[in-house]
Amino acid sequence: MSQKANSQLAECAVHPIGLHDAKKITTEKHYMKTWPQGAACAFGMFYKGRCVGCMVAGYSPTTERKVKKWCTKIQHNQYIELQRTWISDAMGHNSESWMMARVMRILKASGVWLVLTHSGGCKDDVGFIFQASGWLYFGCDPCSDFYETNKGEFKNLVSAMRFGRVPKDVLKLGPQAIGAHLFGEGKIVNARRHLYIYPIKKGIRRRLMKKTLPFPKNPAIFRQGQKWIPNGGVCTRHQPLPVSGSLPDSPAIQ
């Protein structure tokens, strides 16, 4: 059954916003409660004068390497990485894809040819929103660099280690010990990091469509808004650990 059109969207608008404002929104509202390294620009979605959505884009330390694997001649100012997305749960269906389409228009107007992003990482989210919004899929890698504290907060170990906050003797003990040293009691989340690319330039899209992979399906858990919904499908985690944070070690039960 098809859903009715979301009437809220007729009163919405998307505009660039300052990084200071985006950081405040992201660290308060996004499920990770963190600000991404290398953030370069941000966009707000406004409904009746209120900010009900935020997208942050920029350059992580691995952005260039991942882009150049697929587009070797593209220039730095022609690509960017979508790093954070938050949409208020008060907004109706299709709000995220609606905002994403308008952000892509703004990026296109500024000369961006290609956008990349990831799904999964701290959860077994295969990226349904990207699959429904014209993104292309380029596989996944095992991911064990997210740590879930006993308070339910997700922390990125790689970002923390980059600034020399972990003694060498702790580094030798592995991710679990590193997470405990940095953030207290918790568990490593063992999942996958899925790579999606949105080619804005038609020529790049035509070329990359020949290399794209089938979309992954049936995650153990997926994101709906800022909430995580158990799924009755097969778990897609890569070699799950006996204890893996909030991810179930067997297919989740609805």
Regions found by a protein language model. Give the residues of each.
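A short, polar/charged loop/turn motif at coil->beta-strand junctions and beta-hairpin connectors
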Residues: Q8, H20, C51, I74-H76, ...
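Conserved beta-hairpin
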Residues: T26, A40-Y59
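Acyl-donor binding region in acyl/amide transferases
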Residues: A13-P16, A39, G58-G186
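Short hydrophobic/aromatic beta-strand or adjacent loop that forms the aromatic wall/cage
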Residues: A40, A191-Y196
